[in-house]
Amino acid sequence: MTAEQHAGPGAETRCGFVALIGAPNVGKSTLVNALVGSKVTIVSRKVQTTRALIRGIVIEGTSQIILVDTPGIFSPKRRLDRAMVTTAWSGAHDADLVCVLLDAKKGLDDEAQAIIDKAAAVAHQKILVVNKVDLVPREKLLALVAAANEKLPFARTFMISALSGDGVDDLKQALAAMVPPGPFHYPEDQMSDAPMRHLAAEITREKIYSHLHQELPYQSTVETDSWTERKDGSIRIEQTIFVERDSQRKIVLGKGGATIKSIGAQSRKEIAEITGVPVHLFLFVKVRENWGDDPDRYREMGLEFPRE
């Protein structure tokens, strides 16, 4: 069905890009998945999970909302950190609307205040989205909303729980009305602009985050080397997990290969659920010293390589 058929004769379609910005772990990826109604971006309790711009696509009435899940904004130290923060702000400046997410529990901490201050320079309508409202008393929420709007007057304010879904539909309807008039950019059955091989790599990276609780996840990356559709309808996927040292490789493998087997089993199951076909996943772990300084790895992640 085309956008015009979906909208009905004479109905005006709308389409626009909406960037979600905020501190790490504020719930941007969870919100994108809740709005889309399907998993298009990985979610982890660890900060800095999202590294590149991931777009989720939502149809609401006669509007197509293209959500841009940006990396969390923080004080960058490593080259990779700088690339992620630069990518986040470029996503905000390139969008039609900007949703500034705040964590209701953390309130207007230094990180949140710095983001709001910088968001003032973005020349688009800005929407305040206070997430995790189920964890905070209403009086504290109202004070937080008032303080945030005093720093930067927002076009709209929403209080939501991305995890439970409370308030998400109201936000979706508002975004549908606020994106500019125009034709749909993507087919109506498309939920993300990320290729499946990229999402598959992200899913495996998510499983690394959930299995390994030290710094290792931040010093690793995953690439899909091959994606082959077999005659029986199943998919064969080969992926490489890059780490910086041999000691890290041993951690990923685990005793007798137990850790990598568990990571692979969970990743395989989730990829199969998303694709709807059986998946044969083969994982390899390789040491690539200083991969965080390799321009090719940045291109694979969809990031611009910082020269300094």
Swiss-Prot record:
Gene3D superfamilies in UniProt: 3.30.300.20, P-loop containing nucleotide triphosphate hydrolases
GO molecular function: GTP binding; GTPase activity; ribosomal small subunit binding; small ribosomal subunit rRNA binding
Membrane topology classification: Peripheral membrane protein
InterPro entries (alphabetical): G_ERA_dom (IPR030388), GTP-bd (IPR006073), GTPase_Era-like (IPR005662), KH_dom-like_a/b (IPR015946), KH_dom_type_2 (IPR004044), KH_sf_prok-type (IPR009019), P-loop_NTPase (IPR027417), Small_GTP-bd (IPR005225)
Subcellular location: Cytoplasm; Cell inner membrane
Family the entry assigns: Belongs to the TRAFAC class TrmE-Era-EngA-EngB-Septin-like GTPase superfamily. Era GTPase family.
PANTHER family referenced in this protein's UniProt entry, alphabetically: GTPASE ERA (PTHR42698), GTPASE ERA, MITOCHONDRIAL (PTHR42698:SF1)
Protein's UniProt name: GTPase Era
Gene behind the chain: era
